[in-house]
Amino acid sequence: MATPTLTFTSSDGVDIPVERDVAERSQLIKNMLEDLGETGEPIPIPNVNEAVLKKVIEWCTHHKNDPPSTGDDDDSRRKTTDIDEWDQKFMQVDQEMLFEIILAANYLDIKGLLDVGCKTVANMIKGKSPEEIRKTFNIQNDFTPEEEDQIRRENEWAEDR
């Protein structure tokens, strides 16, 4: 039997067909369908453009048979920054797309994708100095040298020795 299909409309007005079981990886969409039922009308996704929405749907399609997320109680999974190989390849995108995927996953309440996106950013930061992190994310240092010294002294206890 064919899987029912929904239509998402991206913020830039593009209609994208999505299998219902794929769409329901989004807790937001799943709850909406449970509350309102399926109307056959396109579902507007106002905060997500076509390119990002297609990436999110690609991830959801790959993970559609994963067990549902159990919520925040799985501490061991959250504490690791390990990412499976498919997800690592999926997240090999430019920084702007990576951050857009994270924002979309948060908006659509797709916990697994949000975790993978955040772990990807964590791995980009891991082991880097503040200067290297600023360079990676193109962040301007707005501290004076005196302020920076004071912050280093106040946080000496947290430094790796």
UniProtKB/Swiss-Prot annotation:
Subunit text: Component of the SCF (SKP1-CUL1-F-box protein) E3 ubiquitin ligase complexes.
Any single GO CC term annotated in Swiss-Prot or TrEMBL for this entry: nuclear SCF ubiquitin ligase complex
Pathway info: Protein modification; protein ubiquitination
Pfam families listed in its UniProt record: Skp1 (PF01466), Skp1_POZ (PF03931)
InterPro entries per record: SKP1 (IPR016897), SKP1-like (IPR001232), SKP1-like_dim_sf (IPR036296), SKP1/BTB/POZ_sf (IPR011333), Skp1_comp_dimer (IPR016072), Skp1_comp_POZ (IPR016073)
Lineage: Eukaryota, Fungi, Dikarya, Ascomycota, Pezizomycotina
UniProt function note: Essential component of the SCF (SKP1-CUL1-F-box protein) E3 ubiquitin ligase complexes, which mediate the ubiquitination and subsequent proteasomal degradation of target proteins. Controls sulfur metabolite repression, probably by mediating the inactivation or degradation of the metR transcription factor.
Protein name as catalogued: E3 ubiquitin ligase complex SCF subunit sconC
Native source species: Aspergillus oryzae (strain ATCC 42149 / RIB 40)
Keywords of this entry: Ubl conjugation pathway
Family (UniProt): Belongs to the SKP1 family.
PANTHER family given in the database record: SKP1
CDD domains associated with the record: BTB_POZ_SKP1
SMART domains per the UniProt record, alphabetical: Skp1 (SM00512)
